[in-house]
Design a protein with these regions (language model features):
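Alpha-helical transmembrane segments and membrane-interface helix-loop junctions
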Residues: 1-171
């Protein structure tokens, strides 16, 4: 039950990241059309930047579980089974701690943006806490994914990162 929920969360996060990329495409096309017709679309570059940050953070957890992140597989493959296990525990432990630390400070930063009514410096004056919300959501999902992999590794001895065979190179 929880496994299906977590896998669904990671997949939904990846889909949301893809939708953010589509939003960027539409923003660029609309901005081009506006320029050709002599109109102005204020804030379009800012919105594209917010969508790019959202796409990046929302994609992290999905990319982690698909094996798309750069890993130190050359080193891990050279180690024995026991040393590899401890190295993976160490890496997931550090990654989990850093992800939760980052999440906490994004939460604090967003709290300050709300408290001080922080707005963007562009023409549109977008409230920054709105632009920071997808970044916070993505960092929470990444921290959950790293915690999930760490706990799975400690309990079963194997992490849940599955790399697609077509994406790997011959070793």
């Amino acid at each position: 039950m929880i496994r299906k929920l977590l896998d669904g969360l990671y997949t939904a996060s990846g889909v949301a990241a893809g939708l953010c990329l589509i939003v960027i495409l539409f923003l660029i096309v609309i901005q081009m059309l506006a320029r050709w017709t002599g109109e102005v679309f204020p804030g379009a570059p800012d919105y594209a930047g917010y969508a790019m940050a959202a796409a990046s953070f929302l994609a992290f957890a999905n990319a982690l579980n698909k094996g798309s992140h750069i890993r130190v597989s050359i080193l891990l493959n050279a180690l024995g089974e026991r040393a590899r296990f401890f190295m993976e525990v160490w890496c997931f432990g550090i990654g989990t701690a850093v992800a939760w630390y980052m999440t906490y400070y994004i939460w604090v930063m967003r709290g300050y943006a709300i408290r001080f009514n922080d707005v963007s410096q562009g023409q549109d004056a977008t409230p920054m806490h709105i632009a920071q919300a997808p970044i916070l959501i993505g960092s929470v999902i990444l921290a959950i994914a790293l915690t999930d992999n760490l706990i799975t590794l400690l309990v079963t001895g194997k992490h849940r990162i599955v790399r697609d065979v077509t994406d790997t190179q011959a070793e």
